[in-house]
């Protein structure tokens, strides 16, 4: 059984979700790192790094699935998102974890059957696939979707090699 950490990076809210990939796939934990608006970017990035490093130390995932940056109309927003991803990647690399990156559309396709699925559809499918009583917060659901997408690609390596999964 492989423990997978999914991360949905954001400069204000970073979602995380950890699953054990088995039969059935099982939720370990999920949540969000909420970063104060009044904090500067450097402080928020430090909190992302520290929060994920603590989560990794506590739950000992073996692999990481990280959502790739999507093209954003606002360059400043895209740069901040890129910085948040960098803080998340650094926490994972410092822990010696292999990281697979997936495009948002690839994650949605794997979880909801459509690369254009909305957040409600993704949340519903995450809840159904993990047999949860309630839906996780949006950012945590997106992180769990990344982890589930990675679990799917792990079980179908040829598919992963041909659909854009990057390690």
From Swiss-Prot:
Keywords: Cytoplasm, DNA damage, DNA recombination, DNA repair, DNA-binding, Endonuclease, Hydrolase, Magnesium, Metal-binding, Nuclease. The active site is at residues 8, 67, 139. Pfam families: RuvC (PF02075). Its cofactor is Mg(2+). One of its GO terms (molecular function) is magnesium ion binding. Its main location: cytoplasm. GO terms for biological process: DNA recombination; DNA repair. Its EC number is 3.1.21.10. It comes from the Bacteria. InterPro entries: RNaseH-like_sf, RNaseH_sf, X-over_junc_endoDNase_Mg_BS, X-over_junc_endoDNase_RuvC. It is an enzyme of class 3 (hydrolase). Belongs to the RuvC family. This is Crossover junction endodeoxyribonuclease RuvC. It comes from Halorhodospira halophila (strain DSM 244 / SL1). The lineage of its organism: Bacteria, Pseudomonadati, Pseudomonadota, Gammaproteobacteria, Chromatiales.
